[in-house]
Structures are given as structure tokens and as C-alpha cells.
């Protein structure tokens, strides 16, 4: 089961109006929420794994990593309704080698809607669409 046209529109409209112009801020917030929820996963990121959580947002390696992730997510959002699943699946081999599994992607993606609601004016429809998108995108990775 994929996303509906209305869900894709909700995600893309919010993205283009509220996220596209502040990718770094959105990325930093999503990752911070993720690492707060799953602090043990900080070990996956050797370039900043020794940085305390409160110091991450000002760490250049953290900022570079979060920007890399959100730039790719930007491509995935553009491709919703098309090859978004294939784009996600393409990340499996390189991340699997680091011990990062589709489960980790799912944990991160499930937080996106909430972060967008808290910090980037996402409405409940968009938040719910992101919840469904997390499941659809992770399923495509398997």
C-alpha cells in the first residue's frame, strides 16, 4: 500500500513552503530528536560520537551529517508517488555496512512529522501523512 495523492500533496506542500528554505535547521532538529530518543545510536556517527548531546547543534561534523541526510530526504520527498522507495532502498547497502538498518531509518522517519509540527508549522494531516510515509518508505527498503 502506498501513499494517497492527498498524503503526497500534504507532505510536498509543507516541505516546499516550510522546510525547503531551512534544510539545515530542519535536519538538525530531526536528528537531535532522534538522538535524544535513541542516544545509543550516537555511536554510529564516529565523527561526532564523543560530542555530548547538548553540543551537537554547534558541531560542524554533526551539521554536515544532518545536511547530507536532509538533502537526500529532499530528493525522496520530490520523488513521492514515483521512485521514492527505490531511492530509500539504494541506501541499504552502504548503511548496512555501518550497522544501520531499515529499522533505524524507520525510527528516524517516524519522528519527522512530530518535529515538523513542533517546529515547522505542520498541520495534523501532514503529521499523519509523514507517519504513513515512514512505513511505506521503510517497507520499500526491505
Swiss-Prot record:
GO MF: heme binding; metal ion binding; oxygen binding; oxygen carrier activity
**Where does the record place the Globin domain?**
2-142
Oligomeric form and interacting partners: Homotetramer.
Its family remark reads:
Belongs to the globin family.
- What's this chain's function? Hemoglobin F-I appears to function in storage, rather than transport of oxygen.
Q: Which Cys pairs does UniProt list as disulfide-bonded? A: none
- Which InterPro entries does the UniProt record give? Globin, Globin-like_sf, Globin/Proto, Mb-like_M
Q: What is this protein called?
A: Hemoglobin F-I
Q: Which residues cross the membrane?
A: none
* Keywords in alphabetical order: Heme, Iron, Metal-binding, Oxygen transport, Transport
Which amino acid positions bind heme b, per UniProt?
A: 95
Coiled coil ranges? none
UniProt miscellaneous comment: Hemoglobin F-I binds oxygen non-cooperatively and almost independently of pH.
Amino acid at each position: 500500500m502506498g501513499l494517497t495523492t492527498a498524503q503526497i500533496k500534504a507532505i510536498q506542500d509543507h516541505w516546499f513552503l516550510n522546510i525547503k528554505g531551512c534544510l539545515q535547521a530542519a535536519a538538525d532538529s530531526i536528528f537531535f530528536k532522534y538522538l535524544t530518543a535513541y542516544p545509543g545510536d550516537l555511536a554510529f556517527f564516529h565523527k561526532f560520537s564523543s560530542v555530548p548531546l547538548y553540543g551537537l547543534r554547534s558541531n560542524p561534523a554533526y551539521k554536515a551529517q544532518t545536511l547530507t541526510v536532509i538533502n537526500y530526504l529532499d530528493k525522496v520527498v520530490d520523488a513521492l508517488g514515483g521512485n521514492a522507495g527505490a531511492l530509500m532502498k539504494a541506501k541499504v547497502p552502504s548503511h548496512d555496512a555501518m550497522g544501520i538498518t531499515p529499522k533505524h531509518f524507520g525510527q528516524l522517519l517516524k519522528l519527522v512529522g512530530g518535529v515538523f509540527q513542533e517546529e515547522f508549522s505542520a498541520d495534523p494531516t501532514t503529521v499523519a501523512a509523514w507517519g504513513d510515509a515512514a512505513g511505506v518508505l521503510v517497507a520499500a527498503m526491505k
